[in-house]
Amino acid sequence: MPRSKNDKNIISLYALLIGATIMNFLPSIAIQTFGGIIFFVTFIATYILRAKHDVETDHYAHCSYIIKTIWIFSLLFTVGLIISIGAADHSAIINIVDAIQTGAIPTEQQMMDAVLQFGKDNLILFLILFLPMVIYLFYRFAKGLNIILKSKPAIALKGWL
């Protein structure tokens, strides 16, 4: 059965969000920034697309599901970020800040080394706080994408999972 334009739009939203999320884990600030922009623009596009559908349609349900997923993820991410600010070992960053305050100008390599050391020092904390959120995000996107690809009714998109 050929897919409608609306189905293709929803599939594109899921694909863009999954792709943007993956891009945010690649080791390049430029790619991560581009991924963040794609994620944000797709989020806005989801609101716009949802406004074009009646509340009773599957397409409206998919858009609402995507929006709810992103808002729940954002809330969990913010809580995790607040916890990590208080619980993280900031010694690598503090050393660079102290050097700057004494008049030293750290090289780009020294700055990068401090950021990498900060990541190494806090890897377990970051995994505990953020990995469940990322798994939740991918699970929800994969579930929604699977439902539309199999042409199932969007009634299965209710709830937190």
Annotate each predicted stretch with a short phrase:
Residues P2-L161:
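Alpha-helical membrane insertion/targeting regions
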